[in-house]
């Protein structure tokens, strides 16, 4: 697979430059390129246009790592708009201020991020009534 960052390009520029590539092997990565990312300026709605052109999509997250809610929010919105890949930087020690440190998760934060998205995907993909729900329904006398 080839990952191409398309941040800052219009849909016409992307189509002109990458329209002839094998869409099953190219992932268009989008993320508002500023450190840290201002989620209010991120154009998540544009994912729908790219998806209609059958491109695989990814989200390059550069939100402030110390505010994990921003990363979770941005990545969740991207996934719900068609992103199947998430780029998130990791670092062993953010205090060393290496490149991209502002948006880099430390190990424990990254583990929590993975755990969150395992649950997130389970919630999105699950449409079966669980045994727990059936038991609750019966115990509460819900028989409409």
Describe each model-derived feature in a short phrase.
Residues 1-144:
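Catalytic cores and adjacent flexible loops of soluble metabolic enzymes
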């Amino acid at each position: 697979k080839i990952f191409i960052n398309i941040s800052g390009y219009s849909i016409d520029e992307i189509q002109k430059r990458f329209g002839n590539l094998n869409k099953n092997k190219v992932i268009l990565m989008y993320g508002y390129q500023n450190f840290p990312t201002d989620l209010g300026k991120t154009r998540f709605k544009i994912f729908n246009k790219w998806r209609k052109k059958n491109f695989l999509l990814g989200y390059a997250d550069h939100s402030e790592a110390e505010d994990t809610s921003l990363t979770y929010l941005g990545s969740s919105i991207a996934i719900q708009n068609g992103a199947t890949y998430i780029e998130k930087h990791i670092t062993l020690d953010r205090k060393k201020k290496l490149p991209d440190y502002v948006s880099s998760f430390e190990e424990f934060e990254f583990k929590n991020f993975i755990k969150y998205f395992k649950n997130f995907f389970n919630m999105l993909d699950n449409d079966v009534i669980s045994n727990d729900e059936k038991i609750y329904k019966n115990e509460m006398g819900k028989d409409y």
